[in-house]
Amino acid sequence: MTTNELSPEEVRDSKIYIEWGLTEQEYDLIVKELKRLPNFTETGIFSGMWSEHVSYKKSKPILRKFWSSNERVLQGPGEGAGILDIGDNQAVVFKAESHNHPSFVEPYEGAATGVGGILRDIFSMGAQPIAVLDSLRFGELDNAHTKHIVDGVIAGIAGYGNAIGIPTVGGEIGFDGVYAGNPLVNVMAVGLMDQNAMQVGQAKGIGNSIIYVGAKTGRDGINGASFASAEFSSAEKSDRSAVQVGDPFLEKLVMDATLQAIREHSDIIVGIQDMGAAGLLSSSSEMAAKAGMGIHLNLDMVPQRETGMTPYELMLSESQERMVLVVKKGEEQAIIDLFQSADLDAVIIGQVTDDGRYRLNFKNEVVADVPVDFLTHAPKQDLPMIEPARLANFTDEQFEPDMGNVKETILTLLAQPTIASKASLFRHFDSQVRADTAIKPGGDAALIRIRDTQKALAMTTDVNARYLYLNPRVGAKMAVAEAARNIVSTGAKPIGITDGLNFGSPDNPEVYYELDQAVAGINDVAKQLDTPIISGNVSLYNETDGQAIYPTPMIGMVGLLEDITKATRTAFQKAGDNIYLVGRTKDSFNGSEIQKMQTGHIAGQLFDFNDEDELAAQQVILDVTDQRLLNSAHDLSEGGLIVGLLESAFAGNLGFDISVDLADKYLFSETPSRFVVSVSPENRTTFESLAGDRVIKLGVVTADDTINITTTTSDIQLSLIETKKIYQESIAWKLNAE
């Protein structure tokens, strides 16, 4: 037993395992399986591996329902990231991760290490990372602590992403009071690779070596997995020791060396895995489990940056910029030399065994000896679920916006943080560092050129959690649909999904119901779009003092554009172009931005979503884009038609003159399955013939500063310059206000 550690009997009697997240039943199960009391280190490694953050023991029964295979899928859930075939022996690799709890405690480091962790997932698969996107949720901007979190998170993402040289190309940011105590920091990374470079995280081959590479191990992030598997209490002291500290310059060295090793020594590399949640413990044990093997580690060999670290600390540390490689026996020196030439630690710390045991040695003592399969398969929990009481209380009556002064309503709407331009935040991110970004932040989706080809990859993150609060299943369907519309607006065809499932405590039957219904809704539309869910992340226990966030399943989506010369942008391009609305507008106000703005809350039954209308609208855009008939395309979402029109005008610095056969309120309706597009006069006839009765001509793009909108009840004039100023400066003004 290591000095100052509790004895097995003291572990049992003190019940420290409960503090670490194990239940009484789980501890008893461990005792039964081992036929003895687990020691301090063994109890610790079970607490890490059986945490919800690592094991998904509570969410896995639901996650198994995800549809995750079609002819493009080369790697689905279960590895570091998902992989899709994009033709020409190339593949796109992508995944999303969350760093919610750490970003609340230490906003800068929490967000920065979220970027670092997801990038390692990408390059551990053999792919060169090409882009990062962020899906962020914060409390209201009139809260001083929220401003502190926003500043720290934005700086952390920029500080890490810019330094490592991977462009941050897009994402979305929302603000709602429910996130004040639980901000959400979801990061999606995308990589590109040749298919023959694909790696997996496995430890097979008896006697093969386990090589530790990268940064030294410290005490940062210990218990990070357990920390992310519990809800907050505002009365509790923040656990800063559970937050990792990142070094992007070191990460760049690790990334480059890892990709070089794969290029030059793929014949001797058996497996690669990032040390993420639960650190060395999770990466090594999961690699053994995938191969049905055992592992023997000598912890004396683990590089340490702090003195006196215990086996418990060495195994559960979540120090950043570390990888595990499994290399063929006798071939280790080539890998060691490569990493050491980059001034990185590279040392053999163990071997693959055939006994199915996870065995740890420290100072000539066996400090852990447990079955790999048992360690890596936490007992699943099928939890009870019940429809939230609020849903039964919502009426089907749609909220009626107050249209007393339409012009003022528009200007006030543009100043709302969820609607207003995020340019003052995105400007901190380097979106052009690799010079392949064709559509930068601020458009519907980012577009990245694939070098030496005509192709491009479109990518986006989307979710409107207010919709899910009103109807989890329909809201989730709409999240997938909106992501797809954003991809389609660039001209690309959606090909796959990664998810970031952010929810409250699954121990609450109402929250578990929300999770179940959200997954069902995602599946519903994903199957129809032929976009398999190939990777993802679950972040539960997003609660503070019993107050849960809205159900927030972030949808990360990637699309493929076969010919980048057909790419379409959000901005109106030239005066005289015809403006069209694709799709029908209905009474869709419950859960809308105008409802929140005018009442301070959202309520009521969510408006309808029609799958067939959605697919038809998207197909119209794809068809006319393929014929090069569009000068611009923009999907409609928060804020409705008026916001979509103004965003296209602002992006192109052009005005417009439109007439709509609708009452004023419909300018703010958030009916899904709609786009605003612009078409050159010479293409008008062909466009209308192809699009059919799903489009309505609204008016024309103009070259002057005036925006003219005629409805059945009003004539509205706006100044492009003054309106754009409100849209662009509102968030910066709110952040800087005392």
Curated annotation (Swiss-Prot):
Binding positions for Mg(2+) 1 per the UniProt entry: 97, 537
Enzyme Commission numbers on file: 6.3.5.3
One cellular component (GO) term of this entry: cytoplasm
GO terms of molecular function: ATP binding; magnesium ion binding; phosphoribosylformylglycinamidine synthase activity
Binding site for substrate: 98-101, 120, 244, 318-320, 539
Organism superkingdom: Bacteria
Catalytic reaction equation(s): N(2)-formyl-N(1)-(5-phospho-beta-D-ribosyl)glycinamide + L-glutamine + ATP + H2O = 2-formamido-N(1)-(5-O-phospho-beta-D-ribosyl)acetamidine + L-glutamate + ADP + phosphate + H(+)
Main location: cytoplasm
GO terms of biological process kind: 'de novo' IMP biosynthetic process
Family: Belongs to the FGAMS family.
Protein name: Phosphoribosylformylglycinamidine synthase subunit PurL
Source organism of the structure: Leuconostoc mesenteroides subsp. mesenteroides (strain ATCC 8293 / DSM 20343 / BCRC 11652 / CCM 1803 / JCM 6124 / NCDO 523 / NBRC 100496 / NCIMB 8023 / NCTC 12954 / NRRL B-1118 / 37Y)
